[in-house]
């Protein structure tokens, strides 16, 4: 009897070691089965991900409008239990089908946008560990700043006959341009080269300038008073951006501009008529669950006309910032 009890104790003592070995082997298998990409394949996949996926799934692939696309993730549920998942668990074949045919949750199908080889490549890519992109400092922002036409060399009055109260700035997304269209005559008055995949155009309070931001983080300032409107200044505010607005409170018209980025998660305050960078502010912080988030992206920015403030919306932390300029 004593011998049997002794053997039972040994079996129980060995159980944690066996379980540890089992899970350790599973982790090793996950690492071993993760696809490998050549440098050229990785570069191509990164480009496609930036153009087609990052807007919904996030630069770090932690999920936003779309789901988390990390190889392995864990999530604590309200009842205290832990849920696990990841792209490795889904596997190559299923991932290819999801990317190709979309989901009921709202993701579009990409089988008519990407080739079969590209679908397979993206399924492999999201099973690899995401690279953390570099930061983008105030110095780098300032180094990117260009003034093509200084303020003192710009027109002192409107040099064309456009009705600036009825002018449209229309995004030409794939060519990285905007078309300035006369609302009275419906004529294209000018096509201006701007950043990649223009996301939004904002008119200044005076009606003289148009601020255009592309998804590559390039902000362009267009002067509508010129005989043929053109870019007079530009600056790169980040690697991935969506929003811009200007100061519109009485007495501050056209004085300041602000642009927000998805990556790095921050906003930049600038001189309104030159785009000279004045300040960079990070939006990293805590979510409503008290968890630190490394990628709280700047969504819409709206300028108040009743206070000297911008309303800056931050996605992942759910914060609405009132920034007094």
Stretches with model-predicted labels:
Residues 187-192, 228-235, 276-292:
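A short beta-strand motif characteristic of beta-propeller blades
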Residues 143-205:
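Beta-strand-rich domains and repeat architectures in extracellular enzymes and scaffolds
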Residues 148-158, 197-203, 239-249, 288-303:
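Repeated scaffold domains used in trafficking and secretory/extracellular systems
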Residues 183-185, 224-227, 272-274, 325:
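Short loop/turn segments that connect beta-strands within beta-propeller blades
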Residues 165-166, 206-208, 253-256, 306-309:
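Short coil/turn segments that connect the beta-strands within blades of beta-propeller domains
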Residues 45, 49-59, 107, 122, ...:
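The canonical Cys-X-X-Cys-His
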Residues 63-73, 97-129:
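Axial heme c-ligation environment in periplasmic c-type cytochrome domains
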Residues 35-46, 58, 62-100, 189:
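Gly/Gly-Pro-rich "capping" loops immediately C-terminal to redox-active cysteine motifs
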């Amino acid at each position: 009897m004593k011998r049997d009890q002794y053997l039972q104790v040994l079996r129980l003592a060995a159980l944690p070691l066996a379980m540890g070995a089992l899970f350790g082997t599973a982790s090793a298998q996950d690492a071993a089965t993760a696809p490998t990409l050549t440098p050229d394949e990785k570069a191509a996949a990164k480009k496609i991900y930036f153009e087609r996926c990052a807007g919904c799934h996030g630069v770090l692939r932690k999920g936003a409008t779309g789901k988390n696309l990390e190889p392995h993730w864990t999530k604590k549920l309200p009842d205290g239990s832990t849920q696990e998942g990841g792209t490795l668990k889904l596997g190559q074949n299923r991932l290819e089908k999801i990317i190709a045919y979309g989901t009921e949750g709202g993701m579009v199908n990409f089988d008519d946008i990407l080739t079969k080889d590209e679908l397979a490549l993206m399924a492999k890519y999201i099973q690899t560990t995401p690279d953390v992109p570099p930061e983008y400092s105030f110095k780098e922002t300032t180094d990117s700043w260009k003034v093509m036409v200084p303020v003192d060399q710009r027109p002192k009055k409107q040099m064309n006959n456009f009705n600036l109260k009825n002018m449209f700035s229309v995004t030409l997304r794939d060519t990285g341009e905007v078309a300035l269209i006369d609302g009275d005559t419906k004529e294209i008055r000018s096509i201006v080269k701007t950043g990649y995949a223009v996301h939004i155009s904002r008119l200044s309070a005076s009606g003289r300038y148009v601020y255009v931001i592309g998804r590559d983080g390039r902000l362009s300032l267009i002067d509508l008073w010129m005989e043929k409107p053109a870019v007079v200044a530009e600056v790169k505010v980040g690697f991935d951006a969506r929003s811009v607005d200007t100061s519109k409170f009485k007495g501050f018209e056209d004085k300041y501009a602000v642009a927000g980025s998805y990556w790095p998660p921050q906003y930049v305050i600038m001189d309104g008529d030159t785009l000279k960078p004045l300040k960079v502010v990070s939006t990293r912080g805590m979510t409503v669950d008290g968890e630190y988030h490394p990628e709280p992206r700047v969504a819409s920015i709206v300028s108040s006309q009743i206070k000297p403030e911008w309303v800056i919306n931050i996605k992942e932390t759910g914060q609405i910032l009132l920034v007094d300029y």
